[in-house]
Amino acid sequence: MSRVVWIVIDSVGIGALPDSEKFGDKGVNTLGNIVKAHSDIKIPNMRKLGIGNIDGVDFMQPIENPIGVYGKCAEVSQGKDTTTGHWEMTGVLVETPFKTFENGFPKDIIDEFERRTGRKVVGNKPSSGTTILDEYGEHQMKTGDVIVYTSADSVFQIAAHEDIIPLEELYSMCEIAREIMMGDNAVARVIARPYVGPKAGEFVRTSNRRDYSLNPFEPTVLDNIKESGLDVIAVGKIEDIFNGQGITEAIHTKDNMHGVDETINYIKKENNGLIFTNLVDFDSKYGHRRNIEGYKEALEEFDTRIPQIIEALNEDDILIINADHGNDPTYKGTDHTREYIPLLVYGKNIKQGVNLGIRKSFADIGATVADILNVKLPKHGESFKNNIEK
């Protein structure tokens, strides 16, 4: 039977959605603006799959005979973050935005967190991760206080130096925060942000990040696959995004290339169902930090691995590559951007060069995955399996 290898290239948006101005994101285009800033970008394998042939892509020449199926998806859910994007992909729409705390967290929340963890809080405001470490990192090392901060996303983030607060204690504090941030105060994610380094300006966040999500509101495609007795193998932060729900096996990764390595390892193993990978570096290392050149280089690095991924596929396997939101490194601020996501599909036994056009929802991807694996379809989404079958 077919397996699906589903790779999320985190934040690689492909142009502003019609409602992007409502989200403060006029004229954004993550991939397009990177290409405009670096016209020498080399992503030949994504181009072979058809990324330059997608409707509305005017920043890259289309090619004559793409080997993949290609299109783009609009987002129905009211958000532009990781949780919202991944949940919609798997058939759960977020129609009421997750709560955000643009002025920091209320005193009663911080008081309860301090009481239950036994640690004082500093920060408690919206900030980028690098800025907050420059501001409070040395204080945190001297005092043992913890840095709590948020962003335009629905997140409660806790930063601590790995030499001062052990990872297990940091993770335990995140579990406490997750319990507190429920009900009327529910945030989409509590995030552990460990860092290392000697002083401000030299602090580096480590790959020991962990996300503590809410459970999806409804069953996802992952639940349907698991309940059918198939594998749902989560690579990278997929397990965290779904709070483990619908997952049969998981491995966390330290960077994009480790994520690709583990994906290829699983493709080569005996398993049935879904291998679901998130490659987060595009977003966390380059999008939020508005590092255009780093983002370009990360795209090129991933592109060089696509032939290895394709070579590892079995005859009936289907590869899907898409993003979950945008994070335009040329845009103001440090937050995600509301964009269409590219959709690339490849398989040795599916059609080539099919234009899927503009899909109405990210959920069409999950519906197609369910359809390919012959499991129950999700509540939302329209499968395009019939468009790609030979």
Question: Where is each model-derived feature located?
Answer:
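Feature captures the catalytic ectodomains and active-site-proximal regions of enzymes
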Residues: 1-390
